[in-house]
Amino acid sequence: MKLEMICTGEEVLAGQIVDTNAAWFASTMMEHGVEIQRRVTVGDRLEDLIAVFQERSLHADVILVNGGLGPTSDDMSALAMAKAKGEALVENAEWRERLEDWFTRNNREMPLSNLKQAMLPESAVMVDNPVGTACGFRVKLNRAWLFFTPGVPFELKHMVTEQFVPFIRDEFNLDSKVALKKLLTIGQGESALADKLEPLELPEGITIGYRSSMPHIEIKIFARGEKAIAVLPRVAGHIKMVLGTAVVAEDKATLAEEIHYKLLNSGLTLSVAESCTGGMITSQLVDFPGSSSYLQHGLVTYSNESKVRVLGVNPSTLDDHGAVSIATVEEMAKGARQILDSDYALATSGIAGPDGGTDEKPVGTVAIALATRGGVYSQMIKLPRRSRDLVRSLSAAVAYDMLRRELLAEAVIVDYQSIGRFSK
């Protein structure tokens, strides 16, 4: 089966918004063992849409079309598909009734413009959208099925998961025997990881892929077929052994997610004091429901005065060692933990750049501490200074990993291949 994707919208074509739908769809299909072979982005011009539908339908077996199903004048996907096939738009009575019911349930009067969303190509098969007003549909043109989906990410994900994936499995008799293991890493570049893994002799049906999403690189281990699935745990275990401390989570999208679930299930509490990370550690945890059960407070103590007055850092420590130092960050962590007697506290202080560095402490120098009931662990690391965002996100990741290792009763401070360290 040859799968392609057509993304629509002037704002997508012009780069005014990042096409996260395309990235999500490609990643999701990969996890189902299907690779997208081509992706095309086209603006909201009727003639361009007609042309791309006609041209790509000669080459693909299935095309997922995303966007252009709304009620406004620049939503042209249904009209373009009808013209590409040489047929009329007709009202889908079932979807019109669904639209009217939706507005009634929400105590709203339905604008006449929304009736456009019930107009489908004459030969179209309606595809349900249980979470929105845009009607999905599929049409056969030339050799391809074109499957039309809304641009709203939440609606797209429902439709792909509940409608598209079952459709292609049935239509093309796809082998559903596909399994995936994800390993999340930090502290090593993609090329360094590949150098370690490419020499491995993998069993038949096992393949490895990489996805860079700084500060993490995700390793995806695919198993296709019953025999490959049976040996997947053994292969994943061997890869973890080869990569060592670089692997920080399994089947989690971020290290913050790993920490969230470990704390959620442990009954332990956490406080955070952040300087250079500016609330990033706290914010990433708050993204997950239930974080209030363990996260007691998150403080952004950016100025020296706030470090002294809020966290109780000794002014002489700042005078003698500076804000970016082991001594200061240890006092920050201790102070943050003591405020509410948390089980743990993380603290960061560093130079994120692009300015502020010195010969002794260049941009990318970050001090991180973890305070526990039994003592304090700390280190001062040297991070790549490619960007301010990278320094901050890597700092948060290393802080999370220190806490993760403490929760597992492992060595809290370890070496990472691409991260230097000034002091333990």
Swiss-Prot record:
SUPFAM superfamilies (UniProt xref): CinA-like, Molybdenum cofactor biosynthesis proteins
Family annotation (Gene3D superfamilies): 3.30.70.2860, CinA-like, MoaB/Mog-like domain
Pfam families named among the record's database cross-references: CinA (PF02464), MoCF_biosynth (PF00994)
InterPro entries recorded: CinA, CinA-like_C, CinA_C, Competence-induced_CinA, MoaB/Mog-like_dom_sf, MoaB/Mog_dom
HAMAP family: CinA_B (MF_00226_B)
Family to which the UniProt record says this protein belongs: Belongs to the CinA family.
Protein name per its UniProtKB record: CinA-like protein
Organism: Shewanella baltica (strain OS223)
Lineage summary: Bacteria, Pseudomonadati, Pseudomonadota, Gammaproteobacteria, Alteromonadales
